[in-house]
Design a protein with these regions (language model features):
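Mixed-charge, low-complexity intrinsically disordered regions
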Residues: 2-63, 74-212
Protein backbone atom coordinates (compact mmCIF):
# COMPACT_ATOMS: atom_id res chain seq x y z
CA UNK A 1 0.00 0.00 0.00
CA UNK A 2 2.81 2.39 0.88
CA UNK A 3 4.54 1.61 -2.42
CA UNK A 4 1.35 2.35 -4.36
CA UNK A 5 0.92 5.64 -2.51
CA UNK A 6 4.54 6.56 -3.21
CA UNK A 7 4.11 5.77 -6.92
CA UNK A 8 0.98 7.94 -7.05
CA UNK A 9 2.75 10.85 -5.33
CA UNK A 10 5.74 10.59 -7.67
CA UNK A 11 3.41 10.45 -10.69
CA UNK A 12 1.52 13.55 -9.55
CA UNK A 13 4.77 15.45 -9.01
CA UNK A 14 6.04 14.36 -12.43
CA UNK A 15 2.82 15.46 -14.14
CA UNK A 16 2.91 18.81 -12.36
CA UNK A 17 6.55 19.36 -13.36
CA UNK A 18 5.77 18.38 -16.96
CA UNK A 19 2.87 20.82 -17.04
CA UNK A 20 4.95 23.70 -15.64
CA UNK A 21 8.14 23.04 -17.62
CA UNK A 22 6.75 21.83 -20.95
CA UNK A 23 3.04 22.39 -21.47
CA UNK A 24 2.68 25.92 -20.05
CA UNK A 25 5.75 27.36 -21.88
CA UNK A 26 4.51 25.80 -25.13
CA UNK A 27 1.02 27.26 -24.75
CA UNK A 28 2.48 30.66 -23.82
CA UNK A 29 4.77 30.83 -26.85
CA UNK A 30 1.88 29.76 -29.06
CA UNK A 31 -0.42 32.45 -27.65
CA UNK A 32 2.15 35.28 -27.61
CA UNK A 33 2.47 35.02 -31.40
CA UNK A 34 -1.24 35.63 -32.05
CA UNK A 35 -2.56 39.17 -32.71
CA UNK A 36 -4.90 39.00 -29.70
CA UNK A 37 -2.14 38.16 -27.22
CA UNK A 38 1.14 39.49 -28.63
CA UNK A 39 3.00 42.16 -26.66
CA UNK A 40 2.58 45.65 -28.12
CA UNK A 41 1.84 49.24 -27.17
CA UNK A 42 -1.54 49.39 -25.48
CA UNK A 43 -1.57 45.72 -24.43
CA UNK A 44 -3.25 44.83 -21.15
CA UNK A 45 -1.30 42.49 -18.86
CA UNK A 46 -3.02 40.52 -16.09
CA UNK A 47 -0.89 39.21 -13.24
CA UNK A 48 -1.65 37.48 -9.93
CA UNK A 49 1.06 37.96 -7.32
CA UNK A 50 1.71 37.01 -3.72
CA UNK A 51 2.17 39.92 -1.34
CA UNK A 52 1.89 41.02 2.27
CA UNK A 53 -1.57 41.96 3.49
CA UNK A 54 -0.35 44.48 6.06
CA UNK A 55 0.43 41.88 8.69
CA UNK A 56 2.85 38.95 8.68
CA UNK A 57 0.71 36.78 6.41
CA UNK A 58 0.62 36.63 2.61
CA UNK A 59 -2.30 36.96 0.24
CA UNK A 60 -3.08 36.85 -3.47
CA UNK A 61 -2.96 40.27 -5.11
CA UNK A 62 -4.42 41.07 -8.51
CA UNK A 63 -2.84 43.54 -10.92
CA UNK A 64 -3.86 44.82 -14.33
CA UNK A 65 -1.32 46.81 -16.35
CA UNK A 66 -1.32 48.71 -19.63
CA UNK A 67 1.79 48.84 -21.81
CA UNK A 68 2.60 52.53 -22.31
CA UNK A 69 6.14 52.40 -23.71
CA UNK A 70 8.48 49.90 -25.38
CA UNK A 71 12.15 50.74 -25.99
CA UNK A 72 14.50 47.85 -26.66
CA UNK A 73 14.15 45.49 -23.71
CA UNK A 74 12.45 48.16 -21.59
CA UNK A 75 8.67 47.76 -21.33
CA UNK A 76 6.93 50.40 -19.24
CA UNK A 77 3.69 49.41 -17.55
CA UNK A 78 1.00 51.56 -15.96
CA UNK A 79 -1.38 50.17 -13.36
CA UNK A 80 -5.08 50.15 -14.24
CA UNK A 81 -6.94 51.60 -11.25
CA UNK A 82 -10.35 53.03 -10.47
CA UNK A 83 -10.76 56.54 -9.12
CA UNK A 84 -12.62 56.82 -5.84
CA UNK A 85 -15.80 58.88 -5.67
CA UNK A 86 -16.67 60.89 -2.57
CA UNK A 87 -15.47 59.28 0.64
CA UNK A 88 -15.65 55.76 -0.74
CA UNK A 89 -12.13 54.41 -1.27
CA UNK A 90 -12.17 51.99 -4.20
CA UNK A 91 -8.55 50.86 -4.03
CA UNK A 92 -6.06 51.44 -1.25
CA UNK A 93 -3.04 50.27 -3.24
CA UNK A 94 -2.09 49.37 -6.80
CA UNK A 95 -3.81 45.99 -6.75
CA UNK A 96 -7.47 45.44 -7.62
CA UNK A 97 -10.09 43.11 -6.20
CA UNK A 98 -10.45 39.50 -7.28
CA UNK A 99 -13.95 40.26 -8.56
CA UNK A 100 -12.89 43.26 -10.66
CA UNK A 101 -9.87 41.31 -11.94
CA UNK A 102 -12.10 38.51 -13.22
CA UNK A 103 -14.65 40.88 -14.74
CA UNK A 104 -12.03 42.94 -16.58
CA UNK A 105 -10.41 39.81 -17.99
CA UNK A 106 -13.67 39.19 -19.78
CA UNK A 107 -14.69 42.68 -20.87
CA UNK A 108 -11.69 45.04 -20.72
CA UNK A 109 -11.96 45.74 -24.46
CA UNK A 110 -15.37 47.33 -23.89
CA UNK A 111 -14.39 49.32 -20.78
CA UNK A 112 -13.41 52.98 -21.13
CA UNK A 113 -9.97 53.43 -19.53
CA UNK A 114 -8.62 56.99 -19.48
CA UNK A 115 -4.97 57.97 -19.60
CA UNK A 116 -4.35 60.76 -17.04
CA UNK A 117 -1.11 62.72 -16.89
CA UNK A 118 1.02 62.48 -13.76
CA UNK A 119 0.80 66.22 -13.24
CA UNK A 120 -2.99 66.12 -13.23
CA UNK A 121 -2.93 63.35 -10.63
CA UNK A 122 -0.19 64.56 -8.30
CA UNK A 123 0.84 68.08 -9.29
CA UNK A 124 -2.17 70.05 -8.10
CA UNK A 125 -3.42 71.32 -4.76
CA UNK A 126 -1.96 69.87 -1.58
CA UNK A 127 -4.17 67.79 0.65
CA UNK A 128 -6.05 66.36 -2.31
CA UNK A 129 -6.28 62.59 -2.74
CA UNK A 130 -4.70 61.96 -6.18
CA UNK A 131 -6.83 58.85 -6.63
CA UNK A 132 -10.17 60.57 -6.05
CA UNK A 133 -12.31 61.95 -8.84
CA UNK A 134 -13.14 65.67 -8.78
CA UNK A 135 -14.53 68.39 -11.03
CA UNK A 136 -11.13 69.27 -12.47
CA UNK A 137 -10.55 65.72 -13.71
CA UNK A 138 -14.13 65.41 -14.98
CA UNK A 139 -13.76 68.64 -16.96
CA UNK A 140 -10.38 67.76 -18.45
CA UNK A 141 -11.15 64.06 -19.01
CA UNK A 142 -14.87 63.78 -19.88
CA UNK A 143 -14.53 60.02 -20.45
CA UNK A 144 -14.30 59.64 -16.66
CA UNK A 145 -18.04 60.34 -16.54
CA UNK A 146 -18.53 57.02 -18.33
CA UNK A 147 -15.94 55.00 -16.43
CA UNK A 148 -13.61 55.86 -13.54
CA UNK A 149 -10.95 53.37 -14.65
CA UNK A 150 -7.69 55.10 -15.51
CA UNK A 151 -3.93 54.70 -15.89
CA UNK A 152 -1.06 57.14 -15.44
CA UNK A 153 -0.11 58.18 -18.95
CA UNK A 154 3.43 58.94 -20.10
CA UNK A 155 3.58 62.19 -22.13
CA UNK A 156 6.89 61.48 -23.88
CA UNK A 157 7.00 57.84 -24.93
CA UNK A 158 10.33 58.07 -26.75
CA UNK A 159 12.43 59.90 -24.17
CA UNK A 160 15.97 58.58 -23.60
CA UNK A 161 17.14 57.17 -20.28
CA UNK A 162 17.99 60.24 -18.13
CA UNK A 163 21.44 60.74 -16.64
CA UNK A 164 20.40 62.43 -13.39
CA UNK A 165 20.31 59.77 -10.60
CA UNK A 166 16.92 60.88 -9.23
CA UNK A 167 15.39 61.04 -12.69
CA UNK A 168 16.78 57.58 -13.46
CA UNK A 169 15.12 56.14 -10.35
CA UNK A 170 11.78 57.55 -11.47
CA UNK A 171 12.35 56.39 -15.05
CA UNK A 172 12.81 52.76 -14.01
CA UNK A 173 9.60 52.61 -12.00
CA UNK A 174 7.43 49.81 -13.45
CA UNK A 175 9.87 49.02 -16.27
CA UNK A 176 10.12 45.32 -17.13
CA UNK A 177 12.09 43.05 -19.45
CA UNK A 178 10.53 42.53 -22.87
CA UNK A 179 12.47 39.29 -23.33
CA UNK A 180 11.17 37.82 -20.05
CA UNK A 181 7.60 38.67 -21.02
CA UNK A 182 7.76 37.21 -24.51
CA UNK A 183 9.91 34.14 -23.90
CA UNK A 184 8.81 33.12 -20.41
CA UNK A 185 5.53 34.86 -19.60
CA UNK A 186 7.13 36.53 -16.59
CA UNK A 187 7.38 40.06 -15.21
CA UNK A 188 11.02 40.77 -14.34
CA UNK A 189 11.67 44.39 -13.39
CA UNK A 190 14.65 46.49 -14.42
CA UNK A 191 16.00 48.10 -11.24
CA UNK A 192 18.79 50.40 -10.07
CA UNK A 193 20.51 48.47 -7.29
CA UNK A 194 22.93 51.15 -6.06
CA UNK A 195 24.66 50.98 -9.43
CA UNK A 196 24.79 53.41 -12.36
CA UNK A 197 23.41 50.86 -14.81
CA UNK A 198 20.08 49.02 -14.45
CA UNK A 199 19.96 45.28 -13.79
CA UNK A 200 17.23 42.68 -13.76
CA UNK A 201 15.54 41.99 -10.44
CA UNK A 202 15.65 38.54 -8.86
CA UNK A 203 11.93 38.78 -8.18
CA UNK A 204 9.79 37.16 -10.86
CA UNK A 205 6.01 37.45 -11.23
CA UNK A 206 3.83 35.27 -13.45
CA UNK A 207 1.63 36.71 -16.20
CA UNK A 208 -1.86 35.26 -16.50
CA UNK A 209 -2.84 36.86 -19.76
CA UNK A 210 -2.01 39.52 -22.34
CA UNK A 211 -4.93 41.07 -24.24
CA UNK A 212 -5.04 43.54 -27.11
Amino acid sequence: MKKILLVVIVAVIALYAFKRMVVEPYLWKKAINTPEHQLQMGSFIFSQQRGHNGSQSMENQYFIFKVTEIQGDFVRLAVIRKLSAGDQIVQGDFSTTKKAYGELKGNIKSVVITGISRNDLYGRRTGRDPHQIDEYLLQKYPALKTSRYYFEDVPDKTRPVPQDPMDRMEYFSLVYSKKAIIEHGRLVAWILNNRPEPELSNRVETIDLILN
